[in-house]
Structure formats: structure tokens, C-alpha cells
Amino acid sequence: MPIRKVEPKDKEELEELANKYLVPLYGDQTKALNERLTGYNYKHALVFEADNGEIEGLVAVSDKPGKNYVKLSTLVVKEEYLNKGIGKSLLEVALKYAKKSGKKEISVTVGEEVEENLHFFCKYGFKLKKELQDKYREGKKELVLVREIK
């Protein structure tokens, strides 16, 4: 499986991914991207890479010490690679990480208006925990979804 850790050389390609898919939903991603490349999330950020070296998707998990859950902070797949099992593969890696870490839950926040994301996570056992208004973007509702780790 072509999943590997994020490396500093990925910065430009990940910036393109963030600008196309994340900025419209969550605003500026500079800080989060830098954390995934060099800081807090570096060891928990993985990319799905094609044979030609192109990054097709990204998953990042935030794991704060002392918490009984992890947060799926990013899961994004390029549009041209949707419905090829990449999102499922990246999610499975995050779920395995959560289980191996002894966590009880994994959570993810999705924009209410992006129905395909909501359906994707619900298909894999995530359930609505709460709604957040204006957390990332003014006038936008976010849904916090949680899945128990067994």
C-alpha cells in the first residue's frame, strides 16, 4: 500500500491540496499545514502516494497526551481519485493508530454543507455527537462525529 509519512518535500503539493479542498471550508490552512510538515502532527500525518510519486490523499491525526480520544484533523482525497478506496485506506490507518494507542474514540469535524463527507464517515460507523456554529467560518455549521474504538 502506498501510504507513507509526510515529509518536508511534500510541502508544495500539500499546499495545493489544502488550497483546493480545505481553504474553502475552513479558511487559511497555513498553520495547520506547517504543523503537519514540521511540528505537532508530523508523526501522525500520512499521504497516499501513487506509483508516479503524486500525492492522492492526506490523513492527519491529532493525539493529545492524557486524552482518551484522537481527532482526525484531516482526511482529504483529490477529486480525481475519489471512489477508488483511498479515503477508506487512509481512514483505516487512522483507526488502527487510535486502537494501537489505546484510545476509546476517534472524532472528526465535517462541514454540514458537504454531504458526501458526512455520508462517508457515517458509512464507517461515525455518529453525530454535537453541532458547532461559526467555529471555522462565520455562518457555517460544523458537525462533530465520533466513532467508538473497539
Feature-to-residue mapping (PLM):
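Conserved glycine-rich acetyl-CoA-binding loop
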Residues: 54, 78-92, 101, 112-118, ...
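Conserved GNAT acetyl-CoA-binding A-motif
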Residues: 98-110
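Conserved catalytic-core motifs of GNAT/GCN5-like acyltransferases
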Residues: 107-111, 122-143
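Accessory recognition modules or surfaces
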Residues: 84, 88, 139-149
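Acetyl-CoA-dependent GNAT
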Residues: 5-74, 78-80, 91-92, 97, ...
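Conserved N-terminal entry element of GNAT/NAT acetyltransferase domains
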Residues: 1-9, 147-150
